[in-house]
Amino acid sequence: MTSLADLPVDVSPRHEGERIRSGDMYVELAGPKSFGAELFKVVDPDEIEPDKVEVIGPDIDEMEEGGRYPFAIYVKAAGEELEEDVEGVLERRIHEFCNYVEGFMHLNQRDQIWCRVSKNVTEKGFRLEHLGIALRELYKEEFGNVIDSVEVTIMTDEEKVEEFLEYARRVYKKRDERAKGLSEEDVNEFYVCLMCQSFAPTHVCVITPDRPSLCGSITWHDAKAAYKIDPEGPIFPIEKGECLDPEAGEYEGVNEAVKEHSQGTVERVYLHSCLEYPHTSCGCFQAVVFYIPEVDGFGIVDREYPGETPIGLPFSTMAGEASGGEQQPGFVGVSYGYMESDKFLQYDGGWERVVWMPKALKERMKHAIPDELYDKIATEEDATTVEELREFLEKVEHPVVERWAEEEEEEEEKAPEEEAPAEEPTMEVKELPIAPGGGLNVKIVLKNAKIYAEKVIIKRADREDKS
C-alpha cells in the first residue's frame, strides 16, 4: 500500500475529536494502564530508509480483544530545510494526524500517549501498518516543502518500547533544556496554539517563554519554528501588547487573542494564576493544580498518579474539572515545563502556596522546588485527607500556616461587628470552588458571595425521603 486511498479506513480531518469508549474499543495502546511514547527526529538522509513503514511487535490482528499493550511511534524525517528546532512541533502533529484516522483515538503527548482502536475498524481490516502509512503520507502532504523523506516505525514489543521510552525521555530533556533562557519581558510576540480545539473548541493555548504549552510539547522556540515552516497552521504569533499586570501575567494582546479565538467565551486570562482568570485547558495537560480552601494552598497531581488526592478526587476527576476550554477558578492544567518556570503561579504565591504533591512528582520536580520548601510539601505518605494535611503543614511550619494566622487576626478584628444582634455569622467569598469527595457529582462555585447561615446541608435528591 502506497497511498491513503489504499487503506481500509478513511483518513480525514473530519474524524478529529472522535472518542472511542471502552465498550467500542478493540484494544488500548499505551495509556495509564500500560506505557509508551512518541518521537519525531530530524536525521541526515543517509540515516533514513525513505517511505519505510515497520511494525515491531504484534499487530492488531495478533492482539486480544480488550487487551492493553505498550505502544510507541517513531517518525524520522530528512530534508535540506529541516532543522532540529522543529522536532517538538512536528512531533505534536502526530496527535493531530493519528486522529485523522477513522477508528483510531490518540490522546496526550510524549511519554503520556493514550490510544485506542475501535472494534468497527478492526473488522474492516485496520492494522498498525495502516496507521504508519497514514502518518507517512500526511507528513509528506502537509510538509512537503521541507520534508524530503519519511520513515515510520511503530512498536508494540514490550522490550523494544521500554528501550525506546528511555531514549525518547533523553531527547525530551535535551529539548526542554534548550528552551530555557528567555523570559516574557525579552520578547514582543507570544504564540497561540489551536491544535486541540477539535476536543475543546474554546481552548486557546498561549505559549510564552515562561509558559510552555499545557501538553509540554511546545516551547516558545518550538512555536516560532512551527510558524516558520507552516504559517497557515494551528500555531501562530500574537502581539503580547501592553502588560496590564506583570505579576498575574495579564497582557492586552493575550486577552484580545483569547477572546477572538474562543468565540468570545473567554475574555481575560491571568497566565500565572490558578484562582483568578486561569488559563483554559483542553485535557492534554501533564498535571493539574488544584486549590485546597481548608489550608489556603495548592495541590498538584499529574496523570501518572493513580490514587486520590487529599480532597478525595483522583487526577481523572480533576482533569474533567480543568478541561473543556472553560475557565475553572481553583483548577488549572499545567506542564512540567511550566512548573520549572520562575513565574510559576507567581500571582498566587508560587511554590510557597504548594502544599501537596504525589511523591513521584515531587521527586521529579525537585530541581524546581526551592530547597527550603521541599521537605515542607506533603505527599501521599504524609497526608491522604485534608485533616492530615493541615496537621502536617503545622508540624513542618509551612509558609501557608502564616496565612492562617493572618486570616484569624482579620476575623478577630471583625468580631465586634459580627456580635451585633442584627448580624448572623458571615462568610464572604470572592470566588471559591468546592469539589466534594465521596463520588458526589456536584460542584459549587461561589462568586462574590456573602452567606448568612448557621448550617448548610447539601443532600442528593435520590437519597431524600419521597414520602
Curated annotation (Swiss-Prot):
Its cofactor is [Ni-Fe-S] cluster. GO terms for molecular function: acetyltransferase activity; anaerobic carbon-monoxide dehydrogenase activity; CO-methylating acetyl-CoA synthase activity; iron ion binding; iron-sulfur cluster binding; nickel cation binding. Keywords: Acyltransferase, Iron, Iron-sulfur, Metal-binding, Nickel, Transferase. InterPro entries: ACS_CODH_B_C, CO_DH/Ac-CoA_synth_bsu, CO_DH/Ac-CoA_synth_bsu_3_sf, CO_DH/Ac-CoA_synth_bsu_arc, Prismane-like_sf. Residues 403-428 are annotated as: Disordered. Its EC number is 2.3.1.169. Monomer. The ACDS complex is made up of alpha, epsilon, beta, gamma and delta chains with a probable stoichiometry of (alpha(2)epsilon(2))(4)-beta(8)-(gamma(1)delta(1))(8). This is Acetyl-CoA decarbonylase/synthase complex subunit beta. It comes from Methanopyrus kandleri (strain AV19 / DSM 6324 / JCM 9639 / NBRC 100938).
